[in-house]
Swiss-Prot record:
Species this protein is from: Bordetella bronchiseptica (strain ATCC BAA-588 / NCTC 13252 / RB50)
GO biological process: 'de novo' cotranslational protein folding; cell division; chaperone-mediated protein folding; protein transport; protein unfolding
Gene name in the database record: tig
Annotated function: Involved in protein export. Acts as a chaperone by maintaining the newly synthesized protein in an open conformation. Functions as a peptidyl-prolyl cis-trans isomerase.
Keyword Amino-acid biosynthesis annotated: no
A molecular function GO annotation: ribosome binding
Protein name: Trigger factor
């Protein structure tokens, strides 16, 4: 008789399972005999130990495994018969009341996958982003590269300006008391690079070698040094050297320093444009994909299995702890990480994953081999030996799978853009690149 699966609430289900004690014991005895052929028991030759002795030493473990196996088989038969897709693992509870002596009974509580309905794509409003790359962006990048290669020349009597390197001594106190990290001598930094807090840079601006200044500085509330975060310090700085940054000319020598073997400035600019366009394309794709996925998940109204959300939370906590370990954070395994901090995003990820999976199936958006190869070849252009990178990915199934997942998402985004209400929006270059 097929067990009856009961709906509790939402995606939660319950089913009663039973296995015969006789069937359990039959399998236990069979496994004990198999173990007995090779088991080493003190006082007996291998394979000659009495079955009763094997029962005492191996019986409990074997019986536990047999019951788990038989109950698991009964559970699979029950859900297969009911044509259910189980999300996560069932929770098994032994039953004793009203159960015959020759039967072991359990109640399995579990969740099922929801019926996922892909929303009407024509009703979705999404944004497709664009950023044109012009000569201005190429020249801007050239300026950044020149500044990175600036040579600093000491200027006597020069008042410091943005782009100058200053060398100074500083000492800070909070309520008249020095604090750790608040003092240094011969400390160099370049004004305008944002390495120091804005108030510190502003205080150093306009000073000449030999000049000093006393000023207050309030540390941000989220400052990395927790002992001074949110507090106001008094700093004294004394400038010892001001050096002007002299930028290199954009010439053959400069081009060669950036890897343009021929020293051809125009080819260098073309290479820079290609690199910018590649980076811009990747960032625009990310923004547009975010808009598409946000629209999908917002329109996807269905319950998600708690088991899948919990599993995602556990995975993200484990990844966060591993990242802390890599950064050398002590006691990374015991740092408090409440599950509720991750649960909202995990629920979104699970919902989106179910939606994307259903959309891929309905619209046949699976990644094609030629798409995967093209994406690998595009990705490989970021490296000095593109052919080796292509071979590296094609030779390993797991690495190819990573690219396949990216291509699949690209296919989903393209499909939604073809069918949704699309608003085009231009993003300023500086904003896109995080420079604004």
């Amino acid at each position: 008789m097929q067990p009856v699966v009961e709906t509790l609430s939402g995606l939660e289900r319950r089913v009663d399972l039973a296995v015969s004690v006789a069937e359990v014991e039959k399998e236990v005895q069979a496994q004990l005999k198999r173990v007995g052929r090779t088991a080493k028991v003190a006082g007996f030759r291998p394979g000659k130990a009495p079955l009763a002795m094997l029962e005492r030493s191996h019986g409990p473990g074997i019986r536990y495994d047999v019951i788990n196996s038989l109950v698991g088989r009964a559970f699979e038969q029950a859900v297969d018969g009911a044509k259910l897709r189980v999300a996560g693992s069932p929770t098994l509870t032994p039953k004793t009341e009203g159960v015959a002596d020759d039967t072991l009974a359990f109640t399995a509580t579990f969740e099922v996958y929801p019926e996922v309905t892909v929303p009407d794509l024509s009703a979705l409003a999404v944004t497709r982003y664009d950023t044109p790359v012009t000569d201005a962006e190429v020249n801007q990048t050239l300026d950044v590269l020149r500044k990175q290669r600036a040579k600093f020349e000491t200027r006597e009597g020069r008042a410091s300006q943005d782009g100058d390197r200053v060398v100074l001594d500083f000492a800070g106190t909070i309520d008249g008391v020095p604090f750790e990290g608040g003092k240094a001598e011969d400390f160099p930094f370049v004004l305008g690079q944002g390495r120091m807090l804005p108030e510190f840079e502003e205080a150093a601006l306009g000073l000449k070698a030999g000049e000093s200044k006393v000023f207050p500085l309030k540390f941000p509330d989220d400052y990395q040094g927790k002992e001074v975060a949110g507090k106001t310090a008094e700093f004294t700085i004394t400038v010892k050297e001001v050096a002007e940054g002299v930028l290199p000319e954009v010439d053959a020598e400069f081009a060669k320093s950036l890897g343009q073997a021929e020293g051809d400035v125009e080819k260098l600019k073309a290479d820079i444009r290609t690199n910018i366009e590649r980076e811009v394309k990747a960032r625009l794709q990310g923004r547009t994909k975010g808009s598409v996925m946000d629209a999908l998940v917002e329109a996807g109204k269905f319950d998600v299995p708690k088991a899948l959300v919990d599993s995602d939370v556990e995975g993200r906590i484990a990844a966060a702890r591993e990242e802390l370990k890599q950064r050398g954070v002590p006691n990374a395994d015991s740092v408090p990480m409440p599950a509720e901090v991750f649960s909202t995003e995990s629920e979104r990820r699970v919902r989106l994953g179910l939606l994307v999976s259903e959309l891929v199936k309905q619209a046949q958006l699976q990644a094609k081999p030629e798409q995967v190869r093209a994406r690998i070849e595009e990705f490989a252009q970021n490296y000095e030996q593109p052919a080796q990178v292509v071979s590296y990915y094609l030779a390993d199934r797991q690495r190819r799978a990573e690219i396949e997942a990216i291509v699949l998402e690209d296919n989903v985004v393209a499909h939604v853009l073809e069918n949704a209400k699309v608003a085009d929006e231009k993003v300023p270059f500086d904003q896109l690149m995080g420079m604004a």
